Each structure stands twice: as structure tokens, then as C-alpha cells.
UniProtKB/Swiss-Prot annotation:
Residues 586-606, 614-633 are annotated as: Disordered. PANTHER family: METALLOPEPTIDASE M28 FAMILY MEMBER, VACUOLAR MEMBRANE PROTEASE. May be involved in vacuolar sorting and osmoregulation. Zn(2+) 2 binds at D178, E213, H311. This is Vacuolar membrane protease. It comes from Talaromyces stipitatus (strain ATCC 10500 / CBS 375.48 / QM 6759 / NRRL 1006) (Penicillium stipitatum). The active site is at E212. The chain crosses the membrane at residues 17-37, 384-404, 439-459, 470-490, 501-521, 526-546, 660-680, 697-717, 727-747. Belongs to the peptidase M28 family. The lineage of its organism: Eukaryota, Fungi, Dikarya, Ascomycota, Pezizomycotina.
Length: 985
């Protein structure tokens, strides 16, 4: 055999070494910064920005979070007093010079101890008395009257801006990020906008609301204050994690979102907004009250990770950072400054419902950050228009290009053979080779990672809780290795120069289908979460079009056939009439048949093997990529150095450098957009299984994003060297073993178990429960000393399991043992009186309840059957918030529970209730034994939530002390302790 020639080294050619190096370096260069941005926060400025004091802010956060301060705790009152003092100090410091410069910038503080509201939602009724703190910094263009003091008077002007944070925490968390950082940011905003030179044009209302953690009560009751008529836009600062970056969670429209673009470190994606619209995210923030019920237009900025510390004792200043505080504060200042300086009338217009503010309507928004430093925002209808355009123009362009290629006789795709002018022979083109590779390779690789997702969800479903990057590594290494291995096998068996163009064509077809789906959602539901698909489709279209344009560099098929035929004729002459290279009809037919196979054709067909004339020793050398062969030539003849390996001879004229352009059109933008989206979603959901969410969802999401990120390698991966895929195979084996056998929790990534103690005040029965995921909740319950020897009952509770046991640890929620005071008998903890009233309209049953509890300001009435109406004495109602169920009397959709919250400790509530007559709904057949009167049964319950002093709730202290270090205890309900008495009326 003659020596195979090599060509000159070309670092940009479509050969194995350049492809491996370029693709690897680009992916590393893009993914590494994305991971850094996800976990490394911007540094705090060395000197204070004008109008701010960062050290003061950090010290305020430490002061705010020195204890648990839920609404139903004495500590909450202390926090409220501290806030009023801090607000007064800030305003007093800046007041003198501010008033001298601009009298219009006066600041007003409203200590709201008057507002209350009754709301009904589903089977739950809530009466709440607010203790909000509202600070109004009058804008230079605001109404100069004190209009809020005149009943029925509304402000004039363009509307103001609301910034909100809630100062209550849960009963088991210090509230550093939920919502301490938001509260401290609000204090600094007051400082900033009362500093001379920063006076707002529009009025600024800063709301410190109390009672968010249980039913968003503080935001609802804010609607009853006159100042709530002023703002048309809002910024809600929240925490659904315990640190990291503050994420733009959702926004109402493009016009308001553009002000977030001013943030020095923007972070977030409209994908999270779609999660709320589609109902995938079940928790809510005050945003839904301001935007949905009151008609404001605004933004929701929140911490979203780590969820393992959210609502636990690790949500404290020690586990957050000054960098997190600065990240939220800088975004709040920049966004608010833009909103209060806005001179447009974009936020004026018709109210979106009765009683809502006249803020007008905005346009749907698309928004996302780039590396945490830049922010893109544009209108949804722009995305829709571009999507429709690409859906039409893309396929049409490829079709027209294909027609032109066919007319010029350069359409080698799908070509089987072509005849020379002399009719001597049919020259094979092998134009079908590679057509079916993408469906097989893409389907196999995707199936492999999806299969891994199901495997993880089955064997070790919680491993993503602490080891999400081990899961990512497993998915990525598996996907790349399988894709490379299958591509190399296919290329080894049937080498083809059409691999790239066919794979790109399939990719564009897939992207086109995805674009159709996302475009439908954009138009029908206003869902913009598929914004990255248009970039995917556009880049893939351009790369595919380039491959089609490359075909213009090829000779006409007839010219190629004539040249091939001429070469054979000359060789016949030179060989003295030898018939070795003269294809007789039988051979020609066989040759044509052999050159038509697809990827599904048997590799053992006929007498020719799939691995014939394939030389490995040359191609394994980096320079050996230039080795090639001609078709129908003698083995001893020199091969064309411009043909890669054993690909089609006509491919010698294809450009060698265009692959880089194609890769750059697809991979970088997709890696950036999809990569950061994948990391964002992973951080948001990988610790949600403990809350009862799907165990499969995080793994399936990682599998999908792995596929989307690395699919751009498929047109090129068959030219990859074996080194990196082999290394990734080892990574896959190691991470697979780890993910299958590793324990999923640790002291830094604890699983949350939900605590509740229920006391029957009539009988003295005392039951403690932990709710969580099996088998971990069962293991934790078994470790509690007071549960030893007890019959621990574990029953399903929705998506979780409740394990409970009888306990002899009585809560000291009325009188602490260390106080020296006599303990109060249990039956005096809750007092109630139920009085039967005269029948109401339509002969409904009526009763009046009076209920109060010692050392609490939260109680509830639970009914065994639904009531149709209720009214709490002294309560306000609002048409924006339904105060009674909309139902026909006697249906099962009535109210089953009324929660009662008072700003006064030990308050007595008076509640009138109505319920349907059993007679009226059962053909006058009355089975009651009380003389024809329908009875109403249920429980009168009060709640206790203050666990700041050890020994107040001994059962909680015991659970915290004896559960394993990988367990975090949080509250299950509005109260840590529920004391109940039964009633019948």
C-alpha cells in the first residue's frame, strides 16, 4: 500500500484537534463565569455611596434579627418600637437641611394602629388588625395638601411609588433575609431620599408591613390606609431563601421593569415569572396583593436560595452576608430612584377593576440578565413578532436555497448517484449518508439523561438537596460521552461529509417546533419563559443556512460525474485494457445499492464490510485528519488530501473553516442564556422536595437543560478526540456511584421538619408532631426521648408524612416556670362563649361566638361543617377582598375556619356566623335530636408562637436538641402550639 499523504496543518480546519480544543475552551470560558456569578456576590464598596451607610445597615440587621419575631410574639412589639425609633433617628438627622431646601420633601410617618380587614379565600376566613409602619416622603411634584386626613379625598398628580418589606419573621427563624434585608434596605431608602440632593419627584411610600408570614395579612390591611391611594407602582423586597443574590422574581410589565435595568448587578429571568403564571410555584409574596388586588404595577425582588435555611434558625445574620445586603440594597436604590424620577405618564390610566388605583396597563415583558452585569428587557409582542417572522422566513430561506442548489445541479443532499454524459457509469454520491444520525444520537443521549433522572428519583431522590453539582456533573458527563460514542461509531461505520448539514437541519426542525409552541404560549397566555428558544432557532437557522451555502462551492454534479468517468477511462487505458476498474452492469448496480444505505442499514450487508478500507493509524494522529480516499481508485494511488478520511470525494471542495462560524452562532448565546437559566432554576428548586414538591422535577430539569446546553455540539462532536470523553466517562461512573449511595443531608444542608404541638384543653391530651419526608421524619421522631416507647403514628399529610406521639411535656405559654408565678390551669387558656341567635334570612341558623386567649393575639374557630357567612365585630370590609364566600347556602364550599388576629394581647373577638338549615336542604327531614335545631360543632383554638425563651415550649426544645444535626426544625402552622376546646351550638 502506498504511503498516505498529509496536508499542511490548519488550526481552523474541521479536524479533530481544532474541534476538540475550540469547543472545549469555549464551553469552559462560558460556563465557569456563569457558575461564579451564581455563587460569588459583588463586593461591598470600600466607601459609602452618597446617602447610604452600609456599616449602619449591617448593624441594623444584626439588631433586627436578635430573636424570633413573628406577629404573635412579644419580640414583634419590640421590633416595631425599634423600627419607629430608627426611622425617627434617620429622619431627624436629615430633616433640617431637607426642609430648608425643599419644603415639598417633607416626611410623614404613619404608625397605623387603626386599619383592620376581613378576607375570605377558599374555605378560610381571616380577620386581621394591622400594626404597619408607613413612611411617606413627599415628592416635589406631589399634591401639597394633607389629603389623607380628609375622608374620601384622593391625591392628585401622576401617582407615587411604594417600596414594601415585612418586619415579622416566622416563629422558628430570625428573619435575616426573610425579610430583614428588605427591611434594612427600606430604612436606607428613607435615609437616601431624605438626604439633600436626592429628593424624589414622585412621592415615595415605604411600607414596613407586619403579618406577611401568615396569609399576607400586612399587605392586605395596608389597603385600608388612605395613603395606599397614592402609589401607582411598587417594589416588593422579599426573601424566599437565606442569602445569595436578590433575584428579580417577577414583574407586571415592560414599562416598570426597565427601571430595574438601572441596577448595577441585575439578576433574574422572566422564566420565574412564568412559574407563577403557570401555577408551578405555590408560595406567594405581597406582590400578589399589590399587583392583583390593588391594581399597582411593580416588581418582586427576592432571595431564592438556599431553601434549606429558609424559615429556620439559620436564617440569621451569621449565615447571610454584607454582600447579600448590598446586592439587594443597590438594586432597591437604583430601581426606586428611577421610579420616583420618572416624568412620563406611563403609569396613569384606567383602573383594572373596582377600587383599584388608576395605574393603567402595561405591555407584557421579556427580561433576563447577562452574567449579573447587564440586563435585557423588551416587550413581549416584540418577541412574538420576531418569533412569527423566524417561523416563516427560516424554512422559506432554506427552501429557496435548496431550489437554487437543485437548479444549479449542486444539490448533493439526498443524492444517490449521478450519470456521466458518456453514460459510462453511474457515479455514487452517497447523499443519504448521515440523514438518520441525529434522531438516533439525540434520542439516545436524551433518553440516557432522562433515564438517570428517573433513576435518581427512585433510588436516592433527595441527593440533589445537598449535591446538585454532582447531579449536574453526572448528567453532563453522561450526555457528552454517549453523544460522542454514538457519533464516532456512526462516523466509523459510514463516514460522510454530510453529518454536519443533516444534524443542523434536524436541529433547526426541532427548534422550529419548539418555537411554534412557545409562540402559541406568548400569544395565548402571555408566557415569555421560552424567550431563549428564538435565539436557539435563529442561531441554528443561520448555521444550517451556512451549510447549505457551502454546497455552492462544490462542482456541479454532472461535472463531478464527468470528471470521475474521465479518470476511470484514462486508468483503463493506462492499465492496458484491464477490466479491474470497469464496472459491469451487475457491479454498478451492487455499488449503487451499497452506497444508498442509511444509519439503519445492516453493517454486514453484501460482501463489503462497514469497516473496509478504514485506516486508524493515520487518523489517530492529529495531522492524520488530512488523510482521505477517492472512490473507485486503486488503493496504491495517492489519495486527495482535501477529503477527510473516507468521506465522499466530492467533499474536497467544501470550506474547512466555516464550522467555527457555525459553532459560534449556536453555542455561546445558548450556553449563556440556557446555562444561567439552568443554574437559576436549580438553585430555586433543588431543595424543595422537603416541602413536598416532586422529587423527579429537579433531576428532569437538569437533564433537559443539559440537553439544551450541549446539543450545539452534535454537528461537530464526531470530530472530537477520545481524551475528554474518556475522562468524562470516569467522571460519570464516579458521580453516579456517589449520587446513588451518598447521604443527602448535612449540617449545612439540613432537611426541614415541621413542628406542631396540639393540646386538648378539655381533656389535657397533648400531642407533638413532626411532618416531613419519609423515611427521614420517621428516623427523626424515633430519636426524641419523649417518643421512646410511644406508639409513633405516621400518616400521610398531602405530599408529606406526619409522625406524632403523645407527650408529657406541657407547654408553658401562659406563665413561664422561671417567672415564679403560679401556673394557669389548661382549661383557662382559651375562653369562649357560644350563643344561639334568632334564625336569619331564608331560615338560616345563626350564632354568636366570643373567644379570647391568654398571652396570645391569635385565635381561630374551626367548624366541622361549612358556614355560609360570618362577621367580626368592628371589622372593615373591602370589595377588592371578598369577606364572605360566594356560594349557595349549604354547599360544601363554605368557610370552615376563621382566623382571628388582634394587635392587643388577650383580646376578645365577637363573631356572628350563619349556616344553612339542615331542614331546608334535606326535604324537611330532620335527624337532629335538639328539637329541630341544626347544631354547629367545632373547636375554639388559640395559637402561641413565641419560642424566644427556652423552656416556654419544652417539646420544641427537646426536638431541636435531640434530632440529628442534619435536621432543621421549622413551624408547620401559624402557631407552634395550638390549644383547643370543643363547642356545640
Amino acid at each position: 500500500m502506498a504511503r498516505l499523504r498529509t496536508g499542511r496543518w490548519n488550526p481552523f480546519a474541521f479536524y479533530r484537534v481544532p474541534v476538540t480544543v475550540v469547543i472545549t475552551l469555549i464551553y469552559i470560558a462560558l460556563l465557569a463565569p456563569l457558575i461564579v456569578v451564581q455563587h460569588v456576590l459583588p463586593s461591598v464598596p470600600e466607601s459609602n455611596p452618597e446617602g447610604l451607610d452600609l456599616l449602619e445597615a449591617w448593624r441594623d440587621l444584626q439588631s433586627l434579627t436578635n430573636g424570633f419575631h413573628p406577629y404573635n410574639s412579644r419580640k414583634n412589639d419590640e421590633v416595631r418600637s425599634w423600627l419607629l425609633t430608627r426611622i425617627d433617628e434617620i429622619i431627624s438627622t436629615n430633616a433640617a437641611e431637607t426642609l430648608t431646601r425643599h419644603d415639598s420633601a417633607r416626611t410623614f410617618v404613619f404608625d397605623d394602629n387603626q386599619s383592620n380587614l376581613t378576607v375570605v379565600e377558599s374555605n378560610l376566613g381571616v380577620y386581621f388588625e394591622g400594626t404597619n409602619i408607613i413612611v411617606y416622603v413627599r415628592g416635589q411634584e406631589d399634591d401639597k395638601r394633607e389629603w389623607w386626613n380628609e375622608p374620601g379625598l384622593a391625591p392628585s398628580g401622576k401617582g407615587g411609588v411604594l417600596v414594601n418589606a415585612h418586619y415579622d419573621s416566622v416563629s422558628t427563624g430570625y428573619g435575616a433575609t426573610d425579610d430583614g434585608v428588605g427591611v434594612i434596605s427600606c430604612l436606607q431608602l428613607i435615609k437616601y431620599f431624605t438626604t439633600p440632593g436626592h429628593e424624589p419627584l414622585r412621592g415615595l411610600v415605604v411600607l414596613f408591613n407586619n403579618g406577611e408570614e401568615d396569609f399576607l395579612n400586612g399587605a392586605r390591611v395596608y389597603s385600608q390606609h388612605p395613603i395606599s391611594k397614592l402609589p401607582h407602582t411598587f417594589l416588593n423586597l422579599e426573601g424566599a431563601g437565606a442569602g445569595g443574590r436578590a433575584t428579580l422574581f417577577r414583574s407586571s410589565d415592560t414599562e416598570v421593569t426597565k427601571f430595574y435595568k438601572r441596577s448595577p448587578y441585575p439578576f433574574g429571568s422572566v422564566f420565574s415569572d412564568a412559574g407563577f403564571k403557570l401555577g408551578l410555584i405555590r408560595s406567594e409574596t405581597d406582590y400578589v396583593i399589590f399587583e392583583g388586588d390593588m391594581g399597582l404595577r411593580g416588581l418582586d425582588v427576592a432571595f431564592i436560595e438556599p431553601r434549606a435555611r429558609y424559615h429556620t434558625n439559620q436564617d440569621d445574620a451569621k449565615h447571610t452576608s454584607q454582600q447579600s445586603l448590598w446586592h439587594m440594597l443597590s438594586a432597591a436604590v437604583a430601581t426606586t430612584e428611577g421610579l420616583v424620577s420618572d416624568t412620563s405618564r406611563d403609569f396613569e390610566g384606567r383602573p383594572q377593576g373596582p377600587g383599584k388605583v388608576p395605574s393603567g396597563t402595561g405591555s407584557g415583558a421579556v427580561w433576563f440578565d447577562l452574567f449579573g452585569t447587564a440586563f435585557a428587557v423588551f416587550q413581549l409582542h416584540t418577541l412574538f413578532a420576531l418569533s412569527v417572522t423566524l417561523l416563516i422566513v427560516g424554512p422559506l430561506t432554506l427552501l429557496i436555497t435548496s431550489i437554487i442548489l437543485a437548479n444549479q445541479d449542486r444539490m448533493y443532499l439526498f443524492g444517490i448517484s449521478v450519470s456521466a454524459d458518456d453514460g459510462f457509469a453511474s457515479v455514487p454520491l452517497r447523499g443519504w449518508r448521515g440523514f438518520f444520525r441525529f434522531p438516533f444520537i439525540f434520542g439516545s443521549t436524551t433518553a440516557s439523561v432522562v433515564g438517570l433522572a428517573f433513576l435518581m428519583a427512585k433510588i436516592n431522590p433527595m441527593i440533589a438537596h445537598s449535591s446538585e453539582y454532582a447531579v449536574w456533573s453526572m448528567m453532563i458527563s453522561a450526555w457528552i460521552f454517549v453523544a460522542w460514542f454514538l457519533s464516532r461509531i456512526a462516523n466509523f461505520a459510514r463516514p460522510t461529509a454530510l453529518h454536519r448539514i443533516y444534524v443542523l437541519t434536524w436541529m433547526f426542525l426541532l427548534a422550529w417546533v419548539l418555537l411554534v409552541i412557545t409562540t402559541v404560549y406568548e400569544n395565548r397566555d402571555g408566557i415569555a419563559s421560552g424567550y431563549f428558544v428564538i435565539f436557539y432557532a435563529f442561531g441554528t437557522f443561520l448555521a444550517t443556512w451556512i451549510s447549505y451555502l457551502e454546497l455552492f462551492s462544490l462542482p456541479k454534479r454532472s461535472d463531478y460525474a464527468n470528471k470521475f468517468s474521465g479518470q476511470i477511462s484514462s486508468r483503463r487505458t493506462s492499465l492496458g485494457g484491464s477490466r479491474l476498474l470497469t464496472p459491469n452492469p451487475d457491479f454498478a448496480g451492487q455499488h449503487q445499492e451499497d452506497d444508498e444505505p442509511t444509519e439503519s442499514t445492516s453493517l454486514l450487508r453484501s460482501q463489503r464490510t462497514s469497516f473496509a478500507n478504514y485506516t486508524r493509524s493515520a487518523e489517530d494522529d492529529g495531522e492524520g485528519d488530512l488523510l482521505s480516499t477517492g472512490v473507485g481508485t486503486d488503493e496504491s494511488e495517492a489519495r486527495d488530501a482535501n477529503v477527510y478520511g473516507y468521506e465522499q470525494p466530492w467533499s474536497a471542495n467544501l470550506p474547512k473553516w466555516t464550522w467555527i462560524l457555525q459553532f459560534l452562532l449556536i453555542a455561546p448565546i445558548i450556553t449563556i442564556l440556557v446555562g444561567q437559566l439552568g443554574l437559576l432554576i436549580t438553585s430555586a428548586i433543588h431543595q424543595t422536595m422537603q416541602d413536598g414538591s416532586s422529587a423527579l422535577a429537579p433531576y428532569l430539569m437538569i437533564a433537559i437543560f443539559t440537553t439544551l446546553i450541549f446539543m450545539p455540539t452534535l454537528p461537530f462532536i464526531h470530530r472530537y478526540t477520545y481524551h475528554i470523553p474518556t475522562f468524562l466517562l470516569l467522571v460519570f461512573i464516579a458521580t453516579l456511584i456517589y449520587n446513588l449511595v451518598a447521604f443527602p443531608f448535612s449540617g449545612n444542608n439540613r432537611i426541614k421538619l415541621f413542628f406542631l404541638q396540639e393540646v386538648d384543653l378539655d381533656t389535657g391530651a397533648n400531642r407533638v408532631s413532626l411532618t416531613g419526608i419519609l423515611p427521614f421524619v420517621d428516623d427523626a421522631a424515633a430519636s426524641i426521648p419523649s417518643a421512646n416507647g410511644q406508639n409513633i403514628s405516621c400518616i400521610p399529610k398531602g405530599d408529606r408524612t406526619e409522625c406524632s406521639w403523645e407527650s408529657d411535656l406541657i407547654p408553658h405559654v401562659i406563665t413561664h416556670p422561671g417567672s415564679g408565678k403560679q401556673q394557669t390551669p389548661m382549661n383557662e387558656w382559651v375562653k369562649y362563649k357560644a350563643i344561639r341567635l334568632e334564625p336569619g334570612r331564608q331560615n338560616t341558623n345563626r350564632a354568636q361566638f366570643k373567644i379570647s386567649g391568654l398571652n396570645t393575639r391569635g385565635c381561630l374557630l374551626h367548624f366541622d361543617k361549612p358556614i355560609s357567612q360570618f362577621h367580626v365585630a368592628g371589622s372593615a370590609t373591602d370589595s377588592r377582598f371578598p369577606s364572605n364566600p360566594s356560594l349557595e347556602d349549604g354547599t360544601e364550599d363554605g368557610v370552615r375556619e376563621i382566623r382571628l388576629w388582634s394587635r392587643i394581647w388577650g383580646n376578645e373577638w365577637v363573631i356572628d356566623v350563619e349556616w344553612a338549615s339542615h331542614n331546608n336542604n334535606n326535604n324537611n327531614n330532620n335527624d337532629d335530636s335538639d328539637g329541630g335545631k341544626d347544631t354547629l360543632t367545632g373547636k375554639a383554638t388559640c395559637l402561641w408562637s413565641d419560642a424566644n425563651t427556652q423552656g416556654t415550649i419544652p417539646a420544641l426544645d427537646e426536638v431541636i436538641q435531640y434530632t440529628p444535626e442534619w435536621v432543621a426544625i421549622t413551624k408547620l402552622d401559624a402557631g407552634l402550639v395550638k390549644g383547643s376546646r370543643s363547642f356545640e351550638v
